[in-house]
């Protein structure tokens, strides 16, 4: 999947990615990152079921 980083807080270690095509927001934790990300970055990611729903994992900048 692809999307855009809407928000990421380095200090707290989490943020949100907006999925391309349907504008769904997905939670991303710092542990799910392959690359460092910043707001506005275009990324590829996978979704994995977490405690509170789907989380973005294996996130890398494209």
Residue ranges and their predicted role:
Residues 2, 25-27, 42:
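Well-ordered beta-strand positions in beta-sheet-rich domains
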Residues 12-17:
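Short aromatic-glycine-enriched beta-strand elements
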Residues 23-35:
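Beta-strand/loop nucleic-acid-binding surfaces
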Residues 33-44:
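Short nucleic-acid-contacting surface segments enriched for D/E, G, S/T with interspersed K/R
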Residues 48-62:
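OB-fold/S1-family single-stranded nucleic acid-binding modules
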């Amino acid at each position: 999947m692809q999307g855009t980083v809407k928000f990421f807080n380095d200090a707290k270690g989490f943020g949100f990615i907006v999925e391309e095509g349907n504008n769904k927001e997905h939670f991303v934790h710092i542990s799910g990152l392959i690359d460092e990300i910043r707001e506005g970055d275009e990324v590829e990611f996978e979704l994995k079921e977490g405690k509170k729903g789907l989380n973005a994992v294996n996130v890398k900048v494209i």
